Structure formats: C-alpha cells, structure tokens
C-alpha cells in the first residue's frame, strides 16, 4: 500500500505506507515472556510484575488487560495473546505511565500549606493583559481542567453603585461579578471535591464590599467556609475542606492601619500630621464598619502583599497563618537573599506568586523557582501557551489530577531547611528509551506536516527541576514515517532532587527549510512515574490530549527511589 503526495500540477510522489509493526526490541520482549508466539495469563502476569513493576497485580488485573484489547480480534482461540494483541496493550490507556486519573493517593489530611495548589492568574481574561475580553468562559475551562484557585479583580463600575470584574487601568472589558460567582459554583467540583479558593484583588469601598459579601453568601450558602476563630496554628486540610469554597483577600482597614505610625518615640511633625489624617479616616471607617463586617467575616485566608522592601513579609505569627503574594521579580529577590527563610515560611503560611506586570502577552515564567522554595500557589495565565504552562499542567497531572499535590518531605522538614541553591549528591538515575510512536495519521491530515512527503519526526526530552538536574536530549530523526521507530538510544538523567523533577517530551517534524512543525507534547511528574514500557499520550499546545497520538517509552530508576 502506498501514499501519494502532489509535487506539482501533473506529478506526484508515492511512498510505501508502513504499517504498525512492533519494533525489534518489543518483539524480543514478547518472546522472552511467551512460548511459540503466544502469551498465557500467567506469562502476562509475570511480565506485568517483573517489567512493569506492578508487584501487587493479580489475575484480575491481567483479565482487565485481556478485555482492554479484545476488540482488536488478535487472540488465539484458546484465549492466548499474540504479539499484535500484546503490542496493542502496550499502546493502550490501560498502560499509562501515571496512576489513573481521578485516583487520589496522596495524604490529604495535612494542613493546606503542605500542598502545591493548581492556581490561575486573572482567571477571567480570554487573551492578553491589555485589551482582551473578560468572560466566564476561561473560568469554567480552568475549573474543568482541575484549577483550584481562581482570581477575580473587583472594581467599582462607572456609576460606582456595583462591583464588576475587570483588569484595572487597562483596555480589557469587564464581566458581571454574579456571572463569575455562579460559574465558579457550577464548576468548582467538576474534577474533584477538594476546595476551591477565590482570591479577590479588592479595589472596592466598604459599601460595595458589603454588597459583595451578600452576593457571596447568597450564591455559595453552605459551601462557603468561614473561620471559627481569628487564631489557629495551621490551616485546615484539603480533606476537611472538601466541597468548600474559601475567600482569600486583604482584610478591610488593614491598609490604613498599616499606615498609622506605632512608636514610643516622639513623632515628627510629618508623622503626627499623617496620624491625625489616618485616625480621622479610621473613625469614618468605623461608621461604615457595620456595612463591611460581613465581608471581613467571609475571608477565610487573610492576605498580604510583599512589595515594601522595608517590611518583613516573611514574619511568621504562630497563631495566624496568612497568604502572602509577590510577583516573579520579587520572588527572585527573595530567593537570592532569603531562600531558606521563604522555605520555612511556606511550611505554615501560603505564598502566591504571580507574573510580572510586563507580561502583557499573558506569557508565563518558570514555576520551579516558586515550587522549590515551597510556594503553594504559583499563579499562571491559563490562556497562555508554551513550555512553562506544559510544565505546570504536568505537575498537576499528579495525585489523580485533583488540583492538589502534596509537597515532598524535603520542603516540610522544620529542622533541616531545604536550600535549592545547594548542590546535592545524585540520588538516582532515570533511564528512558523511546521506542516508537503512532496516531499522527489519525489526528492530523496527511499533508499537515509536509505537502510532499510523510513527516520526519524526532523527539526532544528533558528534565525540569532544580538547576543541577535540568538537562535535555533529542532522538534521531525518523525520515518519512507516520509510525516512527527510534529505540537506539537510552537517555540517562542523573537526579539530585528527584522529588521536584518533571520529565517533558516534545515531538516535532523536522523541516530543512523552515521552522520545525509541532507534533505533540506532554510532561510527567517524576514521583508519579511508573516503571516499565508505557504508552505516553501526547497533548496539543493548549494541553488538550490527542485522541490517538502516543509514544511508547520505557522508564527505570536506578537505583529505585522511594518518594513518599
């Protein structure tokens, strides 16, 4: 069978179409666990245990594999598996490199500060930060992808009689606040029952804060989590907060109170003048306090900004854990000057990182800087694209994709603080071999990659993690093949902090004259990675999984490493 490509109006080129044939290495693997070209239940169970590392698998597990490939009609009449059925099993969703989606397997009973949380930035924007449209659509999409922290910017409307959602001081449009709140309510627990946190960037006067409090109370009712005390040593756990929505923002009056000079020395004329003004405003504020008290009482996680260099935003009140926000530039400053202090602070308190203001194109930054210092809420523009977003999506494929990933022990040890800048010894080596891939012929038009020939695929593969572990490689190019076979090289990744490592793949079609064409990507959290030969499903630029396109890859850690 051949495949034809038009070269000009009257000519065409034909290529012999290659079928889905198992690579030689897979054939040898099958032969090692079969007899006379057929594999029995017991032999398949031995393969699953010895090669795939499924030590606790039994005959029920093997029967599920049989059923998963039964429709391929490649069984021996006695129920034995032929090579092609074995090959289809290896490429099936049953053979994923990660635990099944929806299977939460981390301890969810620790304080909220012990988890990385899937976090969005300016969650209502559909595009750039300057003049794009505001809508509930990106909020819905984010929640349905597992995002658990939604940000809303609240401003008075032009009439000053209601709050609206918009990116202030830009040309972006506004969205109705009630629509946003309802969208969150309707989609908050689509992926998992673990809590959703709404971070409010509040630019409202007390009267509108009171109005927002009524909207929140009416919309969420019993779903709304309320603090039972102003003093507590730790945040509640995700398990305790199941089905709850938490509000996080700066409490009213905090700004003015922070401006009042508290000192025992004789104040200057300038300070005295400011104190009089501030105290007068505070008195006026007290008159309106009855209006805003409901708003203040709804704030489950008190927030503070980290913008003033003279203010110690990492001071830890043992009775009042808080959330501190800082942009990526301020994070870099903190990392250089107070890295271990930041790690200590995040053991009890929450830290939210957000993109710097110059990222007007809604691009993103390296999330690992925040994660390696314990920051729980590394906020991303979910409407953006690119490698950094793929890494973010990869991190939260962990723990069943529930939106919460337990931080590794190294970030929670109160006695030996983790220092990401320190050079650690190699703990283990990840060995990866990419055998083959398939599905592009089903997910793409036959001229998508090249008008005149089948595609020339190659794979880039690398580690995202601490600087010492960050490295990448690429395979050779498989020329003119819809079903490329590589498998000659084994890629070795020496890992000093495997707990924070993610493995990324990017497939491209090689083009000699123009930019290489994108052909799929994915990112896998190393602590979740299963050993053995696995089917790695690829995703498009936005993170949506292709229906058919996969790589067949083997993974092994040498020596084996225990993550949790």
UniProtKB/Swiss-Prot annotation:
GO CC aspect terms: plasma membrane
Annotated catalysed reactions: a 1,2-diacyl-sn-glycero-3-phospho-(1D-myo-inositol-4,5-bisphosphate) + H2O = 1D-myo-inositol 1,4,5-trisphosphate + a 1,2-diacyl-sn-glycerol + H(+)
Domain of life (superkingdom): Eukaryota
Record key words, sorted: Calcium, Cell membrane, Hydrolase, Lipid degradation, Lipid metabolism, Membrane, Metal-binding, Transducer
Transmembrane segment boundaries: none
Residue ranges occupied by any C2 domain in the UniProt entry: 406-539
GO biological process, one term: lipid catabolic process
Positions that bind Ca(2+) 1: 450, 456, 509, 511
Known EC number: 3.1.4.11
Residue stretches making up the PI-PLC Y-box domain: 296-412
Cofactor(s) recorded in Swiss-Prot or TrEMBL: Ca(2+)
Gene Ontology terms, MF aspect: metal ion binding; phosphatidylinositol-4,5-bisphosphate phospholipase C activity
Gene3D superfamilies assigned: C2 domain, EF-hand, Phosphatidylinositol (PI) phosphodiesterase
Keyword Cell inner membrane found: no
Topology versus the membrane: Peripheral membrane protein
Domain PI-PLC X-box: 106-250
Organ and tissue specificity: Expressed in leaves, roots and siliques, but not in flowers.
Residue ranges of domain EF-hand in the record: 19-54
Pfam families for this protein: C2, PI-PLC-X, PI-PLC-Y
Active-site positions on this chain: 121, 167
Induction remark: Not induced by environmental stresses such as dehydration, salinity and low temperature.
Localisation per UniProt entry: Cell membrane
Binding site for Ca(2+) 2: 450, 509, 511, 517
Chain's role: The production of the second messenger molecules diacylglycerol (DAG) and inositol 1,4,5-trisphosphate (IP3) is mediated by activated phosphatidylinositol-specific phospholipase C enzymes.
Protein name: Phosphoinositide phospholipase C 3
Source organism phylogeny: Eukaryota, Viridiplantae, Streptophyta, Embryophyta, Tracheophyta
Gene it is expressed from: PLC3
